[in-house]
């Protein structure tokens, strides 16, 4: 499956890239957002992704836009240290202990002009059976986005206690059958180690029946395990907070989410930030932006997408 950037037009309209601007694509993936930003203005993009397999997409863009894009294989929560390591750095730490202790090198304004996030698993990760993200492809139980973590989906199903499994599936997946699923996993692993995505999906389906639902019974369990493996919610909290602290005056922070837990984190953070610091930050869209009927028809993945954005005023 080709990865199609979700809410691309809406993101670009809000970001409004300018010549000479500095932007951060915090979730590079297949490079859809980065490419669109680079095409829109004579600007620079610093791209971040924890998955080293994205380098093939970066290589294409770096040839097309030499000296205008640079990729960092890192967690986006490290955005401050990443940008401070660049020569010349768009943001550098300074000694004052004020609210904003990051400044743009050689310029009067502070920080970067925009940061964009497209949260969650990508199509290329889902479609690669060896990564273990999807029950549609048989593969090892991995699900780690950096493809090298010692904690993976196998750790979750084969090492955690029953209560931990049940609570995680319920809290991160919203699965009301979480206790039955946890018990089934424990019973299965007593007989043999659970090794593949198909094995796990079959275990879930053995106790949760599809009925008339269009959603596979294993969907919520796989989602919950993926979130747990990659510590996605805490990473999101750290990432958007750090991003908000390096915005320039009039800089924009745009976040696209695909899960209610993610959206709640972003909504709450933006609302609180703008309420407590209304002279510094403002909501760009008071009502969440969702994909159009046309986009959902062309790209079903966009059905659950929600876009929220803020702007730094001073």
Curated annotation (Swiss-Prot):
Name by which UniProt lists this protein: Ribosomal RNA small subunit methyltransferase H
Family as reported in the entry's similarity comment: Belongs to the methyltransferase superfamily. RsmH family.
The keyword Secreted is assigned to this record: no
The keyword Phosphoprotein is annotated on this UniProt entry: no
SUPFAM superfamilies noted in UniProt: Putative methyltransferase TM0872, insert domain, S-adenosyl-L-methionine-dependent methyltransferases
One Gene Ontology CC term in the entry: cytoplasm
Biological-process GO terms, alphabetical: rRNA base methylation
Protein keywords: Cytoplasm, Methyltransferase, rRNA processing, S-adenosyl-L-methionine, Transferase
GO molecular function: rRNA (cytosine-N4-)-methyltransferase activity
One Pfam family per UniProt: Methyltransf_5
Localization (cell): Cytoplasm
Residues annotated for S-adenosyl-L-methionine binding in this entry: 31-33, 49, 76, 118, 125
Chief location: cytoplasm
Summary of the function given for this chain in its UniProt record: Specifically methylates the N4 position of cytidine in position 1402 (C1402) of 16S rRNA.
Reactions this protein catalyses: cytidine(1402) in 16S rRNA + S-adenosyl-L-methionine = N(4)-methylcytidine(1402) in 16S rRNA + S-adenosyl-L-homocysteine + H(+)
EC number: 2.1.1.199
NCBIfam families from the UniProt entry: 16S rRNA (cytosine(1402)-N(4))-methyltransferase RsmH
């Amino acid at each position: 499956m080709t990865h199609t950037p979700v809410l691309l037009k809406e993101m670009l309209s809000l970001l409004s890239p300018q010549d000479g601007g500095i932007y951060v694509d915090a979730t590079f993936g297949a490079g859809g957002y980065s490419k669109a930003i680079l095409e829109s203005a004579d600007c620079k993009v610093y791209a971040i992704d924890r998955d080293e397999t994205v380098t093939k997409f970066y290589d294409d863009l770096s040839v097309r836009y030499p000296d205008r894009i640079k990729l960092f294989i890192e967690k986006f929560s490290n955005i401050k240290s990443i940008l401070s390591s660049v020569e010349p750095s768009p943001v550098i730490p300074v000694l004052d202990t004020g609210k904003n202790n990051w400044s743009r090198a050689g310029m009067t304004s502070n920080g970067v002009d925009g940061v964009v996030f497209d949260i969650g698993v990508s199509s290329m990760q889902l479609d690669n059976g060896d990564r273990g993200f999807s029950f549609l492809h048989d593969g090892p139980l991995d699900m780690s986005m950096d493809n090298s973590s010692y904690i993976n989906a196998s750790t979750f199903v084969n090492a955690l206690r029953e209560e931990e499994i049940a609570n995680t599936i319920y809290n991160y997946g919203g699965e009301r059958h979480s206790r039955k699923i946890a018990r089934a996993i424990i019973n299965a692993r007593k007989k043999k180690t659970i090794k593949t995505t198909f094995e796990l999906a079959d275990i879930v389906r053995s106790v949760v029946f599809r009925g008339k639902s269009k959603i596979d019974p294993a969907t919520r369990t796989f989602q919950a395990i993926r979130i747990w493996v990659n510590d996605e919610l805490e990473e999101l909290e750290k990432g958007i907070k750090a991003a908000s602290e390096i915005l320039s005056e009039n800089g924009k922070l745009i976040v696209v989410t695909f899960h209610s837990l993610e959206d709640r984190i972003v909504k709450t953070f933006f609302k609180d930030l703008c309420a407590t610091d209304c002279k510094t930050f403002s909501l760009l869209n008071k009502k969440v932006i969702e994909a159009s009927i046309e986009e959902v028809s062309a790209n079903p993945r966009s059905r659950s997408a929600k876009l929220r954005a803020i702007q730094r005023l001073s």
